[in-house]
Amino acid sequence: MPAKRNAAPKDVSSATIGFEAKLWLAADKLRNNMDAAEYKHVVLGLIFLKYISDTFEEHRAKLIAGKGDYAGANAEDPDEYKAENVFWVPADARWSHLQASAKQPTIGKIVDDAMVAIERDNPRLKGVLPKDYARPALDKHRLGELIDVIATIELLASSQPSPQPSPTGRGSEHTELPSPLGRRAGDEGRHRSVDLLGRVYEYFLTRFASAEGKNGGQFYTPSCVVRCLVEMLGPYKGRIYDPCCGSGGMFVQSEKFVEAHGGRLGDISIYGQESNATTRRLAVMNLAIRGIEADFGPEHADTFRRDLHPDLRADFVLANPPFNDSDWFRKDDDVRWQFGVPPKGNANFAWVQHFIHHLAPRGMVGFVLANGSMSSNQSGEGDIRRALIEADLVDCMVAMPGQLFYSTQIPVCLWFLTRNKNDGKRRDRRKQTLFSDARKLDTLIDRVHRELTNADLEKITSTYHAWRGDQRVAGPKTPAAKYADIAGFCKSATTAEIAAHGHVLTPGRYVGAEEVEDDGDPFEEKMPRLVAELLAQFAESAKLEKAIKANLRGLGYGG
């Protein structure tokens, strides 16, 4: 069941959410009876078109001014834009032309022609942009109104406050991102409207995922889950890989993390793969609208049938693979099955072994799986899990609250694996695994969905970093926090303890029960008081029952 349309994420400034929600409400009003799965491509395609047009116009103004490095530059030379990683936008594809034509009955064809022209002149975008705005089913009057709504982003940009760091101290919900190669269209002089477009795109992805319900999970992972994965691993430097990348949320959050911690963006490179062609297009636009470069391979492809990055050894793997996928391609002699051949009826441990196969010698991986993966012994899954534990790969397990996902009510967990628990940067964790039970850490955002707040994320991530002895997160001049087991929440267990539990990785097996604070009242005093309260409630219940029966008799019921 879809979430309420007007539900807004928590822990974000009211001014920011008010701006984004206003745009959403205006755009959603124009949806009329169109299915959300179809309408999202209409809206997101236009937001992307405005982004590249605004970026182009800003750089064009610099070239025309001809100051400094731009002296003598030709503003009509596409190479001047490509050299700065700015998309070239032909005159008839620029936003000013579209907005001026918004009231024309041919606006659908005008938008389609603009998309075709942009793809023609920018090979990186070939096959990415939606080009079906002229279809009869799309109301052209409403399309023109939608163009006017998106145009207001530029007008409202100057009134928005700068994004503030999140209360966790680990980054902002809305931080604008340079590219991993240190190149960024417009750099410091970039207009605020361009920055806000990235935020609007992200917000709209969230709302469309909510509107689509189960199908929304195909392209979107809840931001609190993504943040937890990223902040646990801390991808400061190296190659980041997501073999089932959806709309690219893991990559966007990784870049936010690097920027928030003063890392060098040039030290990060991104690799992704997505099997769904439509979702892959969303990912390309999502990263391009933020100036992030990524290698998605030449086209969409099933990761198990055709690995687009066969030689990649990543420093960080972040993923949210399909839960309990029974319809997947298995090759029994696949080189990736180092710990056992996964069952045909469930791809969970196929994904796990694919992640490990692509890990660098000191690499780390964080991913989401259904809770069954922690305890299942069906079809050899228990043997594979035992092999992973005996290989000392399992670093941390986190049980998550229910109802976090739009696509499923299945309880989920986070796995964190590492090839090297004694890397010299943190304490020696060999033969140890941290278990965290975060099932009680959540906030209800509507009647069917929950999310983790910044405080919840801080509790989970700081516990893990303290357990690892991670000096970087604490800061170079600040002693790392000391770790201690907390009954009901976290426990550091040895491999021997895990073996004694049958190699089950469910945190609840290890953390125990939460300590209940004693109110200090002696039992001899407490029990008579509780009995008196109970008897009083019985008496009140009998009184209410008598009154209800009398009312029913007065209505002719009950004899």
What are these regions (language model features)?
Residues 33, 328-346, 371-381, 401-407, ...:
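Short, contiguous acidic/charged loop-to-helix segments that flank catalytic cores in large enzymes
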Residues 29, 38-51, 229, 280, ...:
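Conserved Class I SAM-dependent methyltransferase catalytic core
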Residues 326-330, 366-367, 376-379, 397-398, ...:
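Extended hydrophobic-aromatic, low-complexity segments
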Residues 1-161, 173-174, 189-233, 295-308, ...:
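Non-catalytic, mostly N-terminal accessory regions of nucleic-acid modification and defense proteins
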Residues 313-314, 336, 346-348, 362-364, ...:
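Active-site lining segments that contact anionic ligands and/or coordinate catalytic metals
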Residues 252, 281, 319, 349-353, ...:
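Feature representing long, continuous alpha-helical segments
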Residues 169-171, 183-184:
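Glycine-biased, low-complexity coil/linker segments
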Residues 215-319, 324-328, 333-336, 345, ...:
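Conserved S-adenosyl-L-methionine
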